[in-house]
Amino acid sequence: MSLVVGQSLGLTLVGDGLSLRNSKINVGKSKFFSVNRRRLARAALVQARPKEDGAAASPSPSSRPASVVQYRRADLADDLQAEARALGRAIDASIYSPELIARKHGSQPFKALRRSLEILGALGGFALKLGIDQKQGNLEKNMKKRAIELRRIFTRLGPTFVKLGQGLSTRPDLCPPDYLEELAELQDALPTFPDAEAFACIERELDLSLETIFSSVSPEPIAAASLGQVYKAQLRYSGQVVAVKVQRPGIEEAIGLDFYLIRGVGKLINKYVDFITTDVLTLIDEFACRVYQELNYVQEAQNARRFKKLYADKADVLVPDIFWDYTSRKVLTMEWVEGTKLNEQLAIESQGLKVLDLVNTGIQCSLRQLLEYGFFHADPHPGNLLATPDGKLAFLDFGMMSETPEEARFAIIGHVVHLVNRDYEAMARDYYALKFLSPDVDVTPIIPALRDFFDDALNYTVSELNFKTLVDGLGAVFYQYPFNVPPYYALILRSLTVLEGLALYADPNFKVLAASYPYFAKRLLTDPNPYLRDALIELLFKDGKFRWNRLENLLQQGSKDRDFSAKDALQPVLKLLLDPNGEELRLLVIKEAVRVSEAIALGTVVDTYNSLPEFLRSLVFNGNGNGPLTMSTAELQSTLELRDQVSRIWGLLQSSESFDPAILQPILQVLQQPEARRLGGRVAGGVGQRLAARFLQQLLRATTPSSAPSP
């Protein structure tokens, strides 16, 4: 659930099928605010401050009107104390435990039976239709229709099944593409609960009257979703405008009962359904654990704080502050963000902003989340990504977060390298490192399936390849074979697919892979991690030959990334070359350095030859007016292209904003090392031998000119 002030409707809350209202009242005049005088008398006015590691406040024009009284940011110690108090209020927050929910709901058989009949009544008819389709051979024909029916059934069954369907929409190893597409459309769409209950919950959770905390609050929720609803309010002590999210009464009880029943179905599937190879019970428990974390709003606040610390250093990214002293396990108070949904193209463009710029910011931030720090926003739907009036991209709603293990981050980048190289055997082996397959699974049958799909997909260039097409194709492979896609990877696919979908509103030709490639190129060129260094070597060398076109393309793409550094690109490569264990690579580099040096020298000769008057060419080059070298036309063109390619690569390095001749100083220091001097000597020796051979050929051509082909 997320907040935004819409450009056309006034106050708008964006999210999953949320209701819209825009009225406001004074707290003191509302019939809902019954002030507990005894509690008010003993309660001091709490000076809640957002957490920001002690940095000075930097009010955002998009979220802090000039009329708002600016608050003084607390120092780190006070801030940690405020967070500790919030944690204390959440000390009794429930943690998902299959044993505890079984003990609790197993002792309430009539309640469990009533809900079971409700679920069976909804899903039983659907299962019967599937059985008839299978018997009549109409499964494929009716798949889209059945997927729509399942989405509607999940919506009717309430929050747990809406969340379950959203989770299934990220699992290509469990659901066919038609079901993935339909379940991804599931939206939270529950009616609001009474405002009196919400206000009572705030007072109960924070142990303060509303009048003490707020000077005004909307009398009705700005939005309502499955787990809670949100009010817009103004803090009394500072005038700060905030969003206050209040948890739906009884939601934890309802979700616990549903997961108790769903686990029972999972046990039956694991025991009796052979064609589903995934451990369904483990999958259910992982998902239930994630939903229970969303029920703890202090956990969500900590997620927001961590996210802000990692990613809000960029000028074009906004993460709202948390007000810890007004936050508990059922109440979350955070900075109000004004903005426009990212799929409202006309509203965004009317402010002089470009949707594609904002989406590209989202893609670059998401790539950093997924592959640098590993802590990422797992629910980037349009309501959680807002365009602020000053052009920033605001991230909201941090209930659903996930983490990418460090080894998986590098494995994903390596997987991209294997894809570019069309090395399908290596791609299949990557699935072990990514934990998609258990070590005892033979990947041999999977390789042809990867080849069949990607050979067709890679007929397009990276800039032409549609990410959703790629995901759908991979999903078909995952569905056919015994894959168990980890939750983090499924959420990665969903995040990037959503971002590409948002971009397609503005530009039907936009491709998220093309926008992502500069980041991958920069990481390959600059990251000193040994795994990525090996991946770079694998990308650039083939059959003992260096692929200069690959390096040129990487530099072209990497230089588009705002964080690209020529210094970072040069030094790790040199260190790799001079590593005591790098003899095999040095042999390849020596061979290539000889080729390049020869190409530069011979290119200079050709340029000199071409600049001479025609009568001098015959005099200088042994009476031959057709060319200076004993080389075929194809060989000469290849040599000159190599020289020009190296020249362009050097130009790309020089054009980097971070390029400074001073970066060569540490490189020269590296070259003073004994191994570097030996390497240089071997290169010089190789160049000398090649040029001597060329010179000897030239002399022989002078005595037997007919034996040498004309260039």
Swiss-Prot record:
This protein's UniProt keywords: ATP-binding, Chloroplast, Kinase, Nucleotide-binding, Plastid, Stress response, Transferase, Transit peptide
Family matches, as PANTHER family: CHAPERONE-ACTIVITY OF BC1 COMPLEX CABC1 -RELATED, PROTEIN ACTIVITY OF BC1 COMPLEX KINASE 3, CHLOROPLASTIC
Complex and partners: Interacts with ABC1K1 in plastoglobules (PG). Interacts with PGM48.
Compartments in which it is found: Plastid, Chloroplast, Plastoglobule; Plastid, Chloroplast
Reactions listed under catalytic activity: L-seryl-[protein] + ATP = O-phospho-L-seryl-[protein] + ADP + H(+); L-threonyl-[protein] + ATP = O-phospho-L-threonyl-[protein] + ADP + H(+)
Result after altering residue 399 to D: In rbd1-1; suppression of bdr1-1 and bdr1-2 bleaching and dwarf phenotypes
SUPFAM superfamilies for the chain: ARM repeat (SSF48371), Protein kinase-like (PK-like) (SSF56112)
GO cellular component: chloroplast; mitochondrion; plastoglobule
EC number: 2.7.-.-, 2.7.11.1
Gene disruption phenotype: Suppression of the bleaching and dwarf phenotypes of plants lacking ABC1K1 in red light, associated with the rescue of chlorophylls and carotenoid contents as well as D1 protein level, product of psbA, one of the four core subunits of the photosystem II (PSII). Slight reduction of nonphotochemical quenching after high light intensity treatment. Abnormal chloroplast ultrastructure with slightly scattered thylakoid grana and reduced starch granules accumulation in normal light.
Entries under InterPro entries matching the protein: ABC1_dom, ARM-type_fold, Kinase-like_dom_sf, Prot_kinase_dom, UbiB_kinase
Name the record gives this protein: Protein ACTIVITY OF BC1 COMPLEX KINASE 3, chloroplastic
Range annotated as the organelle transit peptide: 1-42
Family the UniProt entry places it in: Belongs to the protein kinase superfamily. ADCK protein kinase family.
GO biological process, one term: regulation of tocopherol cyclase activity
Residues in Protein kinase domain copies: 216-546
Residue sites binding ATP per the record: 222-230, 245
Organism listed in the record: Arabidopsis thaliana
Residues at the active site: 379 (proton acceptor)
